[in-house]
Amino acid sequence: MAIVNHTLGFPRVGLRRELKKAQESYWAGNATQEELLTVGRELRARHWQQQKDAGVDLLPVGDFAWYDHVLTTSLLLGNVPARHQNEDGSVDLDTLFRIGRGRAPTGQPAAAAEMTKWFNTNYHYMVPEFTKGQQFKLTWTQLLDEVDEALALGHKVKPVLLGPVTYLWLGKVKGEQFDRLSLLQDILPVYQQVLAELTKRGIEWVQIDEPALALELSQEWLAAFKPAYDALQGQVKLLLTTYFDSVSQNLETIKALPVQGLHIDLVHGKDDAATLSAQLPANWVLSLGVINGRNVWRADLSNWFERLQPLVGTRDLWLGSSCSLLHSPIDLSVEVRLDDEVKSWFAFAIQKCAELSLLSQALNSGNGQALEAYSAPIRARRTSTRVNNVAVAQRLAAITAQDSQRQNVYSVRADAQRERFNLPAWPTTTIGSFPQTTEIRGLRLDFKQGRLDGNNYRTGIAEHIKQAVAEQERLGLDVLVHGEAERNDMVEYFGEHLDGFVFTQNGWVQSYGSRCVKPPVIIGDVSRPEAITVEWAKYAQSLTDKPMKGMLTGPVTILCWSFPREDVTRETIAKQIALALRDEVADLEAAGIGIIQIDEPALREGLPLHRSDWDAYLAWAVDAFRLNAAVAKDDTQIHTHMCYCEFNDIMDSIAALDADVITIETSRSDMELLESFEEFEYPNEIGPGVYDIHSPNVPSVEWMEALLKKAAQRIPAERLWVNPDCGLKTRGWPETRQALANMVQAAQRLRETQ
């Protein structure tokens, strides 16, 4: 019973983001479809070979996607929204891109599929749409074609298929409401057909992903698994694959399924491998996800060897990544700017494959000696001065409950703020960023690469800030922002100015479609060596008599959008960041900045998958925000901004943030999100976004006025602000000017009618 190792998936984009560049070139009409397809074939061949060379026994096929793997599954099943369908019902690569990007077959705009986070990761998937009486059929053979490719190259492969129950769980009903689980019987024949085709190709194992089993599912959803897998049994062997959390809460359901193996995530789950193994059918393969697919840290293989050795020989064991390596950068070896000490702490996708090979070899031989040397750097890290900062630890230990409390309650603060700012009814503002022009990006790049000295860089940034302030004054906005010309990214910018962070050159991971992000890595205790935003906020305030907002990214968002440490809790990291940013709030206040916005768009994203764990997370997440903000005096107005949020199930926590003003994304939901605030009787001020900044469309004055009137039916007008949905970084100036002018006019009309 030799241990087999495998990965659940591999990054798609390529070391140099080749897929992104090929996609965007094709979309722009600068490359043919065949050229795009060639890039895909080359990437798949390279990635299979890289995994094989690193010692992976069983290679995943079907993890590659032209846009998103859930969207690929939709096409496999023939699930194409009517607005994106070809007249003849055919499905091709352009169909896939139309769904992801928002086009009709005629080339006219048509709403893209909704996009949302893949469980609790920073990857986004395209939400499947379901309609009553919908038909499904095998229309997109990408998986089968890629299996043929891999077999032709001589690889031993394991096709990857998103499971039917999770697929339905991920989707949304459109039009007439019905139970989407009723579609299960309609999609199973397509799954049967795919498995039959794989059987014909001599495939032994199929990895069938059901990450929904890591959730606390209702009985209705749990009951769907048995009939689904009864229908799928009897062809190839099925490895039921779960990840992102433990599955013990659903173990009775899992044990009854006619599958041949189970994969569990031992990195993020709380399951004990030996306990779980004893409860599973003896003839099942148990695949243990021991290498973290969602982070960049080198594994302590010696520790895993000690934990897993008692299981060897008790049953068929596989070793795998905790989840797909999609969420990890590709290759550490190209990171030439990281110093040797820090680099020795990391492992990217290729290195993680090698870790699987090392660990499986050691367990198969019964000799873990080779793992000691490999694990030494991660163990030495524990005492590194790069990691441990005594002053941070002392400050963290000294936190009291009072540190998270503003001086007075909101009603008292609101009076002080009204007296200080004397704002009109329906005050207008923006969320923070203004268009990042080619000139601004070029200025930052020239400075970063040494072609521009510091003085000339600051002169250039100051000019862009001056222009942004002048634009806002011309438009008649009430509370201004400096526009963030100096910031490349809302998390990276702060990470670059805080101790405890490092940055990679090529640590790209896919966010969605062709969009890639390069998250910072939190390697040690976080502190602020000097003020970060004060210089530019103070300069911007000097240009106007109107209030100027200071702009900070909040502690939970910085944590969620970085690769975090694994040796301390997320709560500890969040509170370290909060203390650093607390000092920034105090310095902004001392510099005369009276309104400070602390953005927390990731607050909801950080929720654990198990609802039973929510309260503990929300308690420390809210406390981190309050710790960050509570140093402010009564007449300093604290704003926060959240986007892509559903609030109704966390309203207590939103209110507990105790921000004076919260701005939220509501235009796309036609103000429906405000229902949560109305029902809860949210006590503080709210700025419901009145137009969607993700679209170049310019909303009319009448449209925004109507939305604001709708908002005033739910929230008292004296507590309403007027603002866009989100920052304007990705927009151009022409539509920004026009949209904001209309927004200001809508607010003025409402003032006149009050």
Swiss-Prot record:
Pathway: Amino-acid biosynthesis; L-methionine biosynthesis via de novo pathway; L-methionine from L-homocysteine (MetE route): step 1/1. One of its GO terms (molecular function) is zinc ion binding. One of its GO terms (biological process) is methionine biosynthetic process. It is an enzyme of class 2 (transferase). Zn(2+) binds at residues 641, 643, 665, 726. Catalyzes the transfer of a methyl group from 5-methyltetrahydrofolate to homocysteine resulting in methionine formation. Its EC number is 2.1.1.14. Keywords: Amino-acid biosynthesis, Metal-binding, Methionine biosynthesis, Methyltransferase, Repeat, Transferase, Zinc. L-homocysteine binds at residues 431-433, 484, 599. This is 5-methyltetrahydropteroyltriglutamate--homocysteine methyltransferase. 5-methyltetrahydropteroyltri-L-glutamate binds at residues 17-20, 117, 515-516, 561, 605. The active site is at residue 694. Pfam families: Meth_synt_1 (PF08267), Meth_synt_2 (PF01717). Its cofactor is Zn(2+). Belongs to the vitamin-B12 independent methionine synthase family. Binds 1 zinc ion per subunit. InterPro entries: Cbl-indep_Met_Synth_N (IPR013215), Cobalamin-indep_Met_synthase (IPR006276), Met_Synth_C/arc (IPR002629), UROD/MetE-like_sf (IPR038071). L-methionine binds at residues 431-433, 484, 599. It catalyses: 5-methyltetrahydropteroyltri-L-glutamate + L-homocysteine = tetrahydropteroyltri-L-glutamate + L-methionine.
